[in-house]
Amino acid sequence: PLHTVLYEDGAPAGLYCLKIQDFNIAGTALRVGGIGTVCVDGRSRGKGHLALLMQDAQERMQAAGCDIAMLGGQRQRYERFGYVPAGAHWEFTLTPRNVRDIRTGGVALAPLAEYPSWLESARALHEKQPVTCARGGDASFLTVLQSWRAEPYAVLQDGMFAGYCALAEGKPPRLQELVLPDAALLPAFAAALAQHTGAAGVRVQ
């Protein structure tokens, strides 16, 4: 990601981060520019700095050939720059009580980096999904899965690789990525996940 700082009289007055990623959505290649960490020093507000930051981001994305620009934030702030709501965010908490009558059925979690073959299988699985983002080779793929202080896990079925997930730190921990080719494993996975995280449960988003 590229961080850009706006200076006023030699002092930092604003900042934004731009990350450009290549996606494949149902066979269509799309370059997406993601904007984040947009902020202006409280002492410098009301001077048009936010508009300058957004204009700079727009120019950089156009120069990079981005097809889509996305960000998260207050609608009333960013609609002025042409951004509109474009999705829904679902979140819930899974606790051991929710799955107390479901057996793990031989499903378990193990650190993904434990065996190179698991990591290779996870990357191959990711690349087969209908919506993917270019993540590079195995080492880069693992680094991405570790974002937000996450621990990547292999999902095992009777000791064999069956999928992968990434569990981020938190109270409760957060399941931030899950790929299971066989949807029939979801109940057993939920039970194994609840068992792994303990009484705190897990936040799913």
Locations of the language-model features?
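Short loop/turn motifs at secondary-structure junctions and domain boundaries
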Residues: 1, 27-29, 143-149
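Conserved beta-strand in the GNAT
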Residues: 5, 11-21, 32-39, 154, ...
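Short coil/turn motifs at secondary-structure junctions
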Residues: 21-23, 43, 76
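Short loop/turn motifs at secondary-structure junctions
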Residues: 31-34, 65-67, 174, 197-200
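Conserved acetyl-CoA-binding loop-helix of GNAT-fold acetyltransferases
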Residues: 35-40, 46-59, 182-194
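Conserved active-site alpha-helix within GNAT-family acetyltransferase domains
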Residues: 63-67, 73-91
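Conserved hydrophobic beta-strand within the GNAT/NAT acetyltransferase core sheet
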Residues: 69-72, 202-204
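Amide-forming acyltransferase catalytic core, primarily the GNAT-like/NAT-type
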Residues: 85-197, 201-205
